[in-house]
Amino acid sequence: MRNIILPAILVCFLISPVYCESFKDFQAKQAQNQEVFNKKEAEKKKNYEQEQLKKFKKYKTKKQQEYDAYRRSVNEKFAEAMKQKWTARKKNAAVPVPKSKEPPKPYVKNDDKRTTAVKLNYAKIVNAESYDDPEPITPVDLEIPEEEIPVNFEQDYKFLYHGTTCKAHFFDSMHFSLPDVSEATVSEVWKKLSSDDFDLLLSDCFDLKDDLRLGDWGYIDMLRVMSEHFLGEESNEAVLLQMFVLSQSGYKVRLARSGDKLILLVPFRTDLYTYPYFILNDGKKYYIIDKEARSQSRTYQVYETSFPREKTASLKMPGTPRLGQARGAGKLFQSRRYQDTFAEVVTNKNLIDFYNDYPVSGSWADYVRASLSDEIKNTLYPALRAQIKGKTKLEAANILINFVQTAFNYKKDVDQFGYEKTFFGDEVFYYPYSDCEDRSILFAILVRELLGLDVVLLHYPQHLATAVNFGNEDVYGSYFVIDGKKYVVSDPTYIGAPIGECMPQFQNSSAEIVKIN
């Protein structure tokens, strides 16, 4: 047996180098074949992707052509209808801001005795407005150029909006003039505006609205500033350009004429105070936004033709506008009961000016949803979070409500301004005084964003307070049951009162519940 095994081992030993060399060749050939295969697959994939991209570009070009054709058709019909005689309308006088009766003075709770907790009744529930942004008549940025269009921003037009540098493509060739404001002349200029020359400008305007987070009112106002910068303050050309961009942006707008002056008319989803208006053929109120135009004669001619899929503007804010910085002096705000709860806050004058021009609205939920600016959040929120860290939701809410109750001085709007004015959150930190509306709005913002709790506003006759849903946490105090959930009264103007305490004069009053979400 040994005589057989040993020769076999010797043979294997002698041929193994040959075998190994052949195996290496085999492996190399396999690797080479795999590389060739991979290259072919990569080439096939590349060809496939190029073919798909080619098809997609062809599709995009076709869709862009369809949109362009649709847009041309809409604007041509709009311009042709503009030649017809405009409708004579009479202006309605502006509705003044309602003067409220004497609001309750801040009620101070001087003892720690708790009142009896009761379930409270409410008169009705006001749901928050739901709203979709208007959509442009055509997506002008659908077809992306093969090469980036060269832009020399030193030659590009720039304009300032509330201290914020804005850029838009408005070149010399885009300038136009209106020798008169007859139907025929305005119609011809509208056709010029509808050309491809203005597509980049439209795209810039859409981007500015989103980038600056302006909301509808801010967008309308920004377009006024831009149009007047390019075409002259209070000029008819500026009004027509503003009207054109708004119509292409998807907004319901109309054009009026008084003598030799063109005037922009804009309806809103809520009534505006202090703005004269027209009631047009669709039954809506169309407001004269331009301050200078409000003093024109009562009789106007109005072009009332509508655009497809146009939407009515809203005063709802998508958030705090992103404006350039104009920092003022810092102010210290400190809680009276919780002395370690304080913050030095700096406000942005550009934002304050923006809010100061904002129409007075009775939609308090909009003020809450606008939140606070990042500048204030960056200093205020870390200070407040440090004090509520590790606390229960109730303990944290009591710290926040005492801060709002005692860190700010109280004065009625009429005494501070001579008229009713509701503050956005940042304004509470800017002006020397605030009232019940302002404090309730600020407290609602803080509770929603720092504690993540749902809040409703309580509208009593001449008073505004809040109620907070603490979820599963058992909280003592007077409360409402809304949609099967318990909301505990929290009054930022009842000085020194903890969560759950209702001002005595409102304990038996039925509040109107204003939802925020």
Name every feature range the model reports, one short phrase each.
Residues 225, 237, 241-385:
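Extended, non-transmembrane interaction/recognition domains
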Residues 1-21:
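Classical Sec-dependent N-terminal signal peptides that target proteins to the secretory pathway
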Residues 172, 182-223, 364-430, 493:
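Secondary-structure boundary elements
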Residues 46, 57-60, 83-245:
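Long, contiguous, compositionally biased segments that the model treats as domain-scale units
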Residues 229-242, 251, 411-465, 469-471:
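Active-site neighborhood of thiol-dependent amide/isopeptide-bond enzymes
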Residues 36, 69, 73, 240, ...:
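Extracytoplasmic/secreted proteins, especially bacterial periplasmic and envelope-associated proteins
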Residues 20-98, 103-109:
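N-terminal propeptides/low-complexity segments immediately following signal peptides
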Residues 253-283, 384, 389-391, 438-517:
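Hydrophobic/aromatic-rich core segments of domains that either
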